[in-house]
Amino acid sequence: MRLEELKRLQNPLEQVDDGKYLLENHQLAMDVENNIENYPLSLQPLESKVKIIQRAWREYLQRQDPLEKRSPSPPSVSSDKLSSSVSMNTFSDSSTPDYREDGMDLGSDAGSSSSSRASSQSNSTKVTPCSECKSSSSPGGSLDLVSALEDYEEPFPVYQKKVIDEWAPEEDGEEEEEEDDRGYRDDGCPAREPGDVSARIGSSGSGSRSAATTMPSPMPNGNLHPHDPQDLRHNGNVVVAGRPNASRVPRRPIQKTQPPGSRRGGRNRASGGLCLQPPDGGTRVPEEPPAPPMDWEALEKHLAGLQFREQEVRNQGQARTNSTSAQKNERESIRQKLALGSFFDDGPGIYTSCSKSGKPSLSARLQSGMNLQICFVNDSGSDKDSDADDSKTETSLDTPLSPMSKQSSSYSDRDTTEEESESLDDMDFLTRQKKLQAEAKMALAMAKPMAKMQVEVEKQNRKKSPVADLLPHMPHISECLMKRSLKPTDLRDMTIGQLQVIVNDLHSQIESLNEELVQLLLIRDELHTEQDAMLVDIEDLTRHAESQQKHMAEKMPAK
């Protein structure tokens, strides 16, 4: 009889192993239809609980084998025991298939076979896993099952704490919605509908059956209370609402509060087990509107637009600063050009408003005079050699001598020393050279004062400013304007119109003076070029005269 019953139970076991994934896929499909997210990993605590019950039941059966050999029981009772042990073909047609059973419903098949013997002990609450446990093995068999369950239940509180720490903070809201759809109350207990049979186990040896008989799970301290009528628990193996006879209840996601110690499956840390809700028990939290979804793309676009605007504002500010600095640099460059291009060092201020310190020093200009023999048309060289002729005036000018003038003066001194030893025929050339040098020195000495006098004459001939006609009571204004200096007291006595006229007149004078300055600079460059050419010619003539003098000096002793 033992082998036949095992063969009969083998087919439901295979169906459970193969149908586990079918049930999971069916549950996922139903959840998708009802817009409920389900995480298969959240079922691990209950699955582990079912596995612990299965192992305990198998060990209990192994312990009952020697007892059955000592006191054999009728075939019908043994058949009822094994048929009531595990029921693997119990499936739910409701919207929420029960994963937590893992194919186990203690006493589901035995309920129909032993319903005729439910007259003697209908109100019994003892832990009786099957009908034969009481009749064949005495109360010690029930204690053996309890001890086996204690062995397998000891590590579960540790696993329970770990699962609570990992899953309770993350899946608080989602698990609450899911549990509420499956019929859970606010305290974590599954609700029972009218007509629902949640826990069925076998009665005593007379065949009596209790409709509300359950198997208690261990308390947090590990002790069992099998005779506690208030502790309606089934070792975590609870069948929730949704049997074939029950109508399908539509589900809706409801957010509800859950104690911090509770976890998935309705287990409470205070009680340590699963409880069943009476038909009229349980209150529901009113439905709350879900939080609006975040539009991340629009948010990113908005942030990018803000960054782009900020960058544009920075670029505009930088462009303004650059334009302001460029204007300042342009004005400064114009002033430097005007200062470097001043015609007279100590002339009047009508040609330039800068000091004469901006002009390059004379030694720096004379330093590039050696390049004149290579290219005397160079403007930079000609500008720096403007005062080369002044070096020849040793008596009236304080400027240092240029290299070329030093050479010419050294040649003249050497000629004067050799003049005594030369013949009278050579005196004509040397005398002529000295005479030309003296005339050049006199002309250079008179050039600077004559230039100053010419500038004064041009200043007197310059037309008066039209401001003098507008301000007859202030005749000194025109003179102050010519000198580029106005007193604050004079400006306070003027009206806005008069000040605007003065400003316009100053702008017009600046433009005219700039044009005149450009013309004078061009003339100066031409004169510098001519001067450089004349200096080169003088240098060549001096060398030629020296060579001729040496040649004639060599011929004289030969004669």
From Swiss-Prot:
Phenotype caused by lack of the gene: Mice lacking all isoforms encoded by both Schip1 and Iqcj-Schip1 are fertile and survive as long as wild-type mice. However, they exhibit mild growth delay associated with ataxia and reduced pain sensitivity. They display decreased thickness of the piriform cortex and partial agenesis of the anterior comissure which could be due to impaired axon elongation and guidance. The morphology of nodes of Ranvier is affected but nerves do not exhibit significant electrophysiological characteristic differences.
Sequence ranges of Acidic residues compositional bias: 167-181, 416-426
Compositional bias annotation for Low complexity: 76-87, 108-141, 198-212
Which residues lie in Polar residues bias regions? 88-97, 314-327, 396-407
Q: What is its main location?
A: other
- Gene Ontology terms: biological process: axon ensheathment; negative regulation of cytoskeleton organization
- Which stretches does the entry tag as region Disordered? 64-141, 161-295, 312-332, 380-426
Where is each IQ domain found? 47-67
Q: Name residues in a coiled coil.
A: 496-530
A Pfam match is SCHIP-1_C
Q: Does the keyword Plastid apply?
A: no
Q: Name one GO cellular component term.
A: node of Ranvier
Q: Where in the cell is it found?
A: Cell projection, Axon; Cytoplasm
Identify a single GO molecular function assigned to this protein: transmembrane transporter binding
Q: Where is this region: Required for interaction with ankyrins?
A: 415-559
Q: Which UniProt keywords apply?
A: Cell projection, Coiled coil, Cytoplasm
Basic and acidic residues bias spans: 182-195, 225-234, 381-395
This protein's assembly is summarised as: Homooligomer (via coiled coil domain). Interacts (via IQ domain) with calmodulin; the interaction is direct and lost in presence of calcium. Interacts with ANK3 (via ANK repeats); required for its localization at axon initial segments (AIS) and nodes of Ranvier. Interacts with SPTBN4. Interacts with KCNQ2 and KCNQ3.
Family annotation (PANTHER family) = IQCJ-SCHIP1 READTHROUGH TRANSCRIPT PROTEIN-RELATED, SCHWANNOMIN INTERACTING PROTEIN 1
What is this protein for, i.e. what is its function? Answer: May play a role in action potential conduction in myelinated cells through the organization of molecular complexes at nodes of Ranvier and axon initial segments. May also play a role in axon outgrowth and guidance.
Q: Which named protein is this?
A: IQCJ-SCHIP1 readthrough transcript protein
- Species this chain originates from: Mus musculus
This chain is encoded by the gene named Iqcj-Schip1
